[in-house]
Every structure is written in structure tokens, then in C-alpha cells.
């Protein structure tokens, strides 16, 4: 899956989780198309469920690339899968950026999605995240909730869809019982898929759409790519040999 034309710049490889939902796959492709309009060649790879894998894409490119892990928290996929895929590709001219989230830009997009779903100031918000067994990812989710809370002006509770406790329906019920307010779920997911579909049964007064294709998200990806390109240039300018330029930045 490739978007854009060859411009002589490093290709961007957008790495997502993967989903069996055709709508989710189409959304990731559409996001790549929007980013490609600004940065040129953009490839999509997946670490699970479907292909191509990051290593397959990077081997096929056999050229400098900037990899953006399109994950909203830094768990196993970011710390283990992505670096392993880069190493397995044999492509030494790869720069891996930090994970996409958490980021204040994503919090702003979440707020926009909430408003689209009918949320109003004074309504309670539950942030629905996929979940992880990695404490670092859970810390990232808490940071994301804090960023969203700064924008809503109220506490944002956290519920998990797949891994971890408490589960989203339980949090929604508790918040409603304690506050007596309407409760909306902010979907801290990139695209539609199994996890987002589960939120329909959470018992909330409204469920926001996933982050999806949004102008601010596109600009964030473009910014991450350009920072990655600059890092490649700095490394090359320092006199590193071409086959020793692989660099994986520490995740946040």
C-alpha cells in the first residue's frame, strides 16, 4: 500500500497495528494519502492481523526511510515489534520516530470527535484505550487522559477495551452513578475495528469516532516525518557510513 510519487526524499513508512475491518484498513490508507500529499512517497505496514509487515516494506524500498509507529501508547509493538522488524529488514537507512501518542494534538482531535458525538461542557468523559500489559503504555494512556482533561476542564476517567482493568462499560456505569451526568466515550483508537465496535455496548450516552483522518493528525504526522528526515541528514552529515545509519529513537 503506497501513496505519493518518488521525490528523492526518504520514504515515510506508517506502521499501524492492523485490523480485519475493511473500514479500518481504508481509513489508514486514506490517512496515508493525506500525508503523502505533503511529504511524498508514503507506505503503510502492519505489525499484526494483515500485511505487509514493516520488514517487508523496508526490504522492498531498499532506500532511506522514516518509520512512524502510529501507536497511541508505547507498549510491546513499539518497544519490541517495530525495532525487530527494522532489524530484520536489513535496511540500514531507517530512522524510527517516537510513537504517535500521547500528544496534545491528539487530545485536540479527541475533543473534536467528542463534540461531533454530541458531547457538551459538563458531560463526563471516559477515555477508551485498547490497553496493554506494559506499564509504560499504561503511563502513556494516563498522560493522554490528562491532556484531554486539560481541554474539557474536567476529570477524564480511563477504561480499557481489550487488555487491562477497569473495562469501559464498568467505568461508564460508575461515572454515571457517581455524577448523575451524561457520559461520553472518547475513542483513543486510530481507526475502526474490533476494539471500536465494542464501544457501542459500553452503555454511554455517546461514543466518539476514532481519531481517523483529521487535518491536525495529518499535520502531526508530517511534522514527525520532517523531523525524522532532518535526523537522517544530520547523521549522514556527521560522516556515518551508508550501511550504518539505522537509528531507532527512544520512545517517550
List the predicted regions and their residue ranges:
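Active-site-proximal alpha-helix that buttresses catalytic centers in soluble enzyme cores
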Residues: 1-252
Amino acid at each position: 500500500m503506497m501513496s505519493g510519487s518518488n521525490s528523492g526524499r526518504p520514504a515515510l513508512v506508517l506502521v499501524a497495528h492492523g485490523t480485519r475491518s475493511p473500514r479500518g484498513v481504508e481509513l489508514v490508507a486514506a490517512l496515508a494519502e493525506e500525508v503523502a500529499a505533503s511529504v511524498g512517497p508514503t507506505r503503510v505496514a502492519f505489525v499484526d492481523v494483515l500485511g505487509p509487515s514493516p520488514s517487508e516494506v523496508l526490504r522492498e524500498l531498499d532506500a532511506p526511510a522514516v518509520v512512524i509507529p502510529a501507536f497511541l501508547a508505547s507498549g510491546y509493538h513499539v518497544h519490541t515489534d517495530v525495532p525487530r522488524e527494522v532489524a530484520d529488514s536489513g535496511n540500514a537507512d531507517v530512522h524510527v520516530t517516537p510513537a504517535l501518542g500521547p500528544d496534545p494534538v491528539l487530545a485536540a482531535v479527541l475533543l473534536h470527535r467528542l463534540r461531533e458525538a454530541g458531547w457538551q461542557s459538563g458531560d463526563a468523559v471516559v477515555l477508551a484505550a485498547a490497553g496493554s500489559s506494559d506499564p509504560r503504555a499504561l503511563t502513556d494512556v494516563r498522560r493522554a487522559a490528562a491532556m484531554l482533561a486539560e481541554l474539557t476542564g474536567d476529570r477524564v476517567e480511563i477504561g480499557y477495551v481489550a487488555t487491562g482493568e477497569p473495562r469501559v462499560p464498568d467505568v461508564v456505569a460508575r461515572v454515571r452513578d457517581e455524577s448523575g451526568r451524561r457520559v461520553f466515550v472518547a475513542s483513543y483508537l486510530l481507526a475502526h475495528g474490533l476494539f471500536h465496535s465494542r464501544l457501542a455496548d459500553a452503555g454511554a450516552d455517546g461514543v466518539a469516532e476514532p481519531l481517523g483522518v483529521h487535518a491536525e493528525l495529518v499535520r502531526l504526522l508530517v511534522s514527525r516525518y520532517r523531523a525524522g528526515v532532518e535526523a537522517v541528514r544530520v547523521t549522514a552529515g556527521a560522516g556515518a557510513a551508508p550501511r550504518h545509519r539505522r537509528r531507532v529513537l527512544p520512545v517517550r
